[in-house]
Amino acid sequence: MAIFRDQAENHVEHDRSIEDRRRHRQLVEKSIKENLGDILSEESIIGETKNKKYKIPIRGIKEYQFIYGANNKGVTTGTGEESRGDRISSDKRKAISNNKAGNQEGKDIYETEITLEELMDYIVEDLDLPNLDKKKYSEIIVESAAKKRGYQKYGVRPRLAKKKTVMCKIARKQGKKRALREIGEEAKIGRFPFREDDLRYYKVKKHPKKESNAVMIFIMDVSGSMDNTKKYLARSFFFVLSRFIRRKYNNVAFEFISHTTTAKNVNEYEFFHKGESGGTYISSGINAAIDLIKEKYNPGVWNIYPFYASDGDNWSEDNEKAMEAVNEISDLSNMFGYIELLPSTYSTTMFYRFKKEISKENFVSVTVKEKKDLWNAIKYMLSEELQEKNKE
């Protein structure tokens, strides 16, 4: 016997479009995360405002449908290990390749737009700042997020406590029923609208909290050996890192140092846009950071995170000084990060010497050989595993 169910009572549970929309949101978020590396490798990202938009390709979702197979004989069964979205067809027909015309249907691809601000939201999900140790005297009082502390009768509409408001209305209605019974009237109460007295709003209170003080020191080699591609990679690394940290933490100071054979403190705009030429003394940039730390940022009360980007091509007479400088700044810092860009020969760059001779646990080095390595380098520098390693 056929059974018919009335689905009109609850449209939400039987609305198929809800599941489609949920799958669509998942697909969009997955595509954005998969394309983060490509977005971060665009030169146009440096210096852009938070409203700058970037296009991301999204594969379309098709409705389920029955299609004709290859007319093969027999019936096949699954292994029981299939998951949603797996292709289980045994059809092995090959697509036309070598840029020749074919007769197979293509995949629907469309684009969605994401702003730089939204991009940072996705980066925040994957990255986290290395541990900010609680320095004894470096805590700053900042205002924390507002917390709900009870209810009140007056407030702004966004803070309306709907559940509490309904409960107040029900209590008033029950009170009216009791009053009618007491005077001998059992009249049925009809429509019972809300009144101003029923409204309840969340009482919000802000509590101050202490937040650790930190300084990020960005050091960049701008010598003649750092061509436009290398400088672009370095600036991309520092730009994304600075935007991420500013978004996630308050009261983080930034210092910018550029160097050739000599180093100088520059402002943020000059750091990301101005170029120079000349020889390379790696020690000059790191020593400038050391002097800055000793002058302004006492390691006993500050969390210090210097990051240095170079192609590793150093003047040979400066190599020993560079080694001494790296050891010293590592002793003064919570973590010192060294990023080597497009190294020509692995064994002849400073990355090789640093890796071999620097034994500091808080010294972290990575190489970026091409644009696509940039995202992985950022993730490695700021990974949670690295935090735990430094904490130990």
Curated annotation (Swiss-Prot):
Signal peptide: none
Chain positions covered by the region annotation Disordered: 75-100
Residue stretches of biased makeup (Basic and acidic residues): 81-94
SUPFAM superfamilies membership: vWA-like (SSF53300)
Pfam families reported for this sequence: DUF444
Domain of life assignment: Bacteria
Family: Belongs to the UPF0229 family.
NCBIfam families for this protein: spore_yhbH (TIGR02877)
UniProt cross-references to PANTHER family, sorted A to Z: UPF0229 PROTEIN YEAH (PTHR30510:SF2)
Protein name, UniProt field: UPF0229 protein CPR_1333
